[in-house]
Amino acid sequence: MDSPIQIFRGEPGPTCAPSACLPPNSSAWFPGWAEPDSNGSAGSEDAQLEPAHISPAIPVIITAVYSVVFVVGLVGNSLVMFVIIRYTKMKTATNIYIFNLALADALVTTTMPFQSTVYLMNSWPFGDVLCKIVISIDYYNMFTSIFTLTMMSVDRYIAVCHPVKALDFRTPLKAKIINICIWLLSSSVGISAIVLGGTKVREDVDVIECSLQFPDDDYSWWDLFMKICVFIFAFVIPVLIIIVCYTLMILRLKSVRLLSGSREKDRNLRRITRLVLVVVAVFVVCWTPIHIFILVEALGSTSHSTAALSSYYFCIALGYTNSSLNPILYAFLDENFKRCFRDFCFPLKMRMERQSTSRVRNTVQDPAYLRDIDGMNKPV
């Protein structure tokens, strides 16, 4: 991902993940907007551009959004992981994938305080090591999340369209193995981000950048290559697979009235499929804008307006907001998660409700007795 400092410039600039992107100074003109870099690669057209003024309110608003994402996302995703570990009935194949998604989201929310600080200070004050860690977490989240959602969609496709094969494929153990493979595959990008990530002092605007550092001679080539790879492998291919899976599932659901031998099982199957579809749809909605921005910038079709730059910041914020939305979706759309959340948050109330339900059940099951005029108990 491009640094906002350089994204709308014609010359090479540091490429970074969204978490490492540095915003311009909220109270100043856009740093380095029309200034050529040290190798003089900026063209005369760039040099004539008027600098864009960014409202001081934008970094404050984004920081407020990140603060909410940090609290809701970290607490919510931690709670999701806890209930899956705590309750045996929650250890299903689908929930194992949800655990993986919650883990990736919880990790990326831990970077929110660092990003908020950068937005307010317009510089990276945390050193080189933390820079590498934050960039790496960001790329891990990006790839792990979309790969997990893709596997969740494939999992639902098998459950709906191939119920017999699902008995062998859809097991918690195999879901755990697939999750491990997802993290190993994402490591090809995450480890590369650790190696390439680092800090760089920009003396012309007196800021420290945290970004991916490519060789200066081939910077433009590596920058474009990275953007295209991220767009294709972290967005286009997974989304196409998801679309195919859900298209086939919709056709299957329309063609049969009863997917399984039981109406209860059929309701559960459709309910879980709907949950996964909503989670996937929300992810795509949240991340599509920033991917489009990056693709447009890579193709050189960029706008130099203040509105475009402001939109870019909010697209980044929208992507991170997704990490705090999933626990809310589970709570509203899945009865099992809702029940477990209530059990954790209100243990005394839930215990009393279970005891009350148990007493009612026992009363219904036991025969009622009436006392006759002789004082003898007779069942009714």
UniProtKB/Swiss-Prot annotation:
Q: Main localisation, per the record?
A: membrane
SMART domains tied to this protein: 7TM_GPCR_Srsx
What does the entry give for GO biological process? adenylate cyclase-inhibiting G protein-coupled receptor signaling pathway; adenylate cyclase-inhibiting opioid receptor signaling pathway; behavioral response to cocaine; cellular response to glucose stimulus; cellular response to lipopolysaccharide; chemical synaptic transmission; conditioned place preference; defense response to virus
Q: Which regions span the lipid bilayer?
A: 58-85, 96-119, 133-154, 174-196, 223-247, 275-296, 312-333
Q: Which UniProt keywords apply?
A: Behavior, Cell membrane, Disulfide bond, G-protein coupled receptor, Glycoprotein, Lipoprotein, Membrane, Palmitate, Receptor, Transducer, Transmembrane, Transmembrane helix
> What interactions and quaternary structure are annotated?
Interacts with NHERF1. Interacts with GABARAPL1.
The protein in question is named Kappa-type opioid receptor
Taxon lineage: Eukaryota, Metazoa, Chordata, Craniata, Vertebrata
Gene name of the encoded protein: OPRK1
